[in-house]
Amino acid sequence: MYRRVLLAALAAAVMVLLAACVFEFDNAGGMVAGTLKEHRETVEMSDKYKTGKPMELNLDMDMAKAVLDSTDESLVDVKFSYSSKALKPELKVDEDEIRIRNRLEGYSFGKAVNNWDVKVTDKLPLEVEVKADASDIRLDMSRMQVNSIDAELNASSARMYFDEQNKVPADKFRINADASSADIYGAGNLGFDVMEIDADASKLNIDLTGFNQKDGEVRIDANASSVKLRLPEDADIRIVIDNYEISSININNDRILSRSEKEYISKNYGNAVRSLEIYADLNITTLTVE
């Protein structure tokens, strides 16, 4: 009887300890353990942030799983979950900048939890900068006012959504991917002037459809990568292959015709209300056009 009581007490103690811990499994099957901490913070909207200039939004993350969405209730609202103090993200807000980053100071590089849930205002124009190392990010900027985007991905995966027409003109959209993957949906809704794509050992799927009436330009510099483009149907399309080293081009769109080995145009070129020019520099890369 005594032994049964002792075993029951030990089992209860173990359950209490487990309740205070986080256990996750990564893709390789390794177990993640640590005490889970949580931090919430909200910065309310006020007139001091309405300067008439775009607000800078800087996200700088390491080993994170991050979700970005919009809010109409505050300037920024964050919820962080982390299993190591060294991973704790820091939120800093000035009159012209929202900055979030985690520094990895003193971290031993074991497996850990570092989750971001970030909501940013849809009331102000934003200049978005993202730096992601060994991270998994989901950015839904459909209802935000996006002036520009500059994303650097290193050994990371990203999904970006632009499901609604941008409320302000976007100057540029730049993505630099190194050993990473990115899926971009509805990029045409941004109404960008120039999209710059720099890919090295990466896989990119870019949906250029969406509503806008601006001419645009896409510049691709890809090395040992796979790039897939989905084209809008309401634009004149011209594709120019500036450099072509041990690469392949797959045209899976009946609208696109070949003018030469390095130039393609859409049917009835010159009749659409806007144009999209695509310039590609390819090295050991597969470019697919749909």
What are these regions (language model features)?
Residues 1-5:
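Positively charged n-region of N-terminal signal peptides that target proteins for export
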Residues 7-13:
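Sec-dependent N-terminal signal peptides
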Residues 17-20:
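C-terminal motif of bacterial Sec signal peptides marking the signal peptidase cleavage site
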Residues 23-101, 113-131, 136-152, 160-163, ...:
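Short linear S-[DN]-x-LW-Φ motif typified by the pepsin-like aspartic protease active-site region
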Residues 40-48, 99, 103-112, 160-290:
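Short, surface-exposed interaction patches in beta-rich subdomains
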